[in-house]
Amino acid sequence: MKNYNTYILIIIISLFSVNCNDDFVDIPPEYSIDSENYFNIPEDYAQAVIAAYDLLQTTYLNSMLGEIASDNTLCGGESATDVPGFQQIDDMIHTPVNDNLQDLWSWMFAGVQRAAYVIEFKDKIDFDGKDALIAEAYFLRAYYNFELVKWFGPIPIKAEGRFSVGDEQRLPRSPISDVYELIEDDLLAAIPNLPLTPGQEGRVTSGAAKSLLGKAYVYQDKFDEASSILEEVINSGAYTLVENYDEIFEHQGENGAEAVFEVQYSDAEGASFDCFQCSEGNIAVGFNGIRQYNGPVFDSGFSFNVPTQEAVDAFETGDLRKDVAILDIVRWAAQRGATYGRGYEHTGYFNRKYIARKGDSNVGDQNLTNPNNYRAIRYADVLLLAAEANARKTTPDENKARNYLNLVRQRAFGTTSKAITASGSTLQDAIFDERRVEFVGEGHRFFDLVRTGRAAQEIDGFTPNKNELFPVPFEEIQFSNGNWEQNNGY
């Protein structure tokens, strides 16, 4: 699974026409294959599912922009015109004409389409292990749709299979509630047929599906349902917090005890600026890197996604996570004799979780092919979501909420003396604050602010009733030929 493209499904659609008269019988070409007759042996399903995994690697963009859009980081880069789409999102002046939002839309729908292809033909043949493969496809479709609904709100959905040419002119953008209903249905279909532990690193488990379902419930304020499913994950015993927070984001910490689901990356195959989606590596790592860096431990990069002073100050005194999450380059350079360049909007800080380390082979462009996995769902996320759900459900269980919250804080401070004893709205605020410092640099902050109604007060330039969602790309609206309306305010 580390190198998805090794097994990428290549589907050749061949159209044959034969001119004949009554003296001849049409015989299908012996080796013709198209999308309708592809699934004939178990290996066909296996390769198609791996092809659906492949688009996960493009979610480097989602994780970067989820920070840049928030109050955690500034866009950075070389200048104010370096990647204009990023700069516009940072300043909350983005429009439907934005190459990066177009990429995000296209790549996530490509993932939906690949997963839906497997689902569409799930009943064509039977074989041992098929149910697990179909379950993976259901999870992946849910994962991509969850990203799409977070970013764009109403989107077209098709439960039974793939989209077809012209669907954009026939299918509506389904309401957000309908999108979440499909996400829930897909995950509930997947869970019974997924293993508790993966047979291969990077593959989906029942714990990953339950965790994503719990998160989808939280995003809809379905806290009773969320608390129930997330506690199944907690009580499974399959996961635990890694004792030392600084181990999580190093290469040796990949797929560890805290990993519920990770996007697998490799430096085995390179990419270029002409084809970001071709990379097997985590492009965000190079983009986040230190400009013109020369020194130990780290490698250089493009100085995007730079943490703000406010994000740094959000850490309490004694929080061991601070120096793991945030690299203070001024202090580091003074201590280690390193040198570096100053990029645009230089804050003096870098996202230490996801910047390049020395020793990576980085095939191709070294800043575009980094092997560091994206920790998409960590056990700490499960605990804090469960804490929030228990604090906010119909009949709150604040003891459970505090217990889950304080498990995360105990790891963060190395002591129980920092335990939270608050209740009511103060407890909820403590959980929100904890999410910020636990997941800074991981792409969750913008969406946490939006779903809890705090974005307008925390994000400079944020316009209520507009910036909760991003615009549907201009080309997609045009292709719909008037069938789709643009999101409010765009």
Segments predicted by a language model, with ranges:
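TPR-repeat structural position
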Residues: 45, 180, 223, 396-398
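Flexible, polar/acidic helix-loop-strand segments at domain edges
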Residues: 92-93, 310-378
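Long, intrinsically disordered, low-complexity segments
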Residues: 20-24, 42, 53, 73, ...
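An aromatic- and glycine-enriched ligand-binding surface/loop that stacks and positions planar moieties
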Residues: 21-82, 188-191, 203-342, 459
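Structural register within alpha-helical repeat arrays
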Residues: 134, 141, 213, 220, ...
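Conserved, well-structured interaction surfaces
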Residues: 42, 46-50, 54-60, 83-152, ...
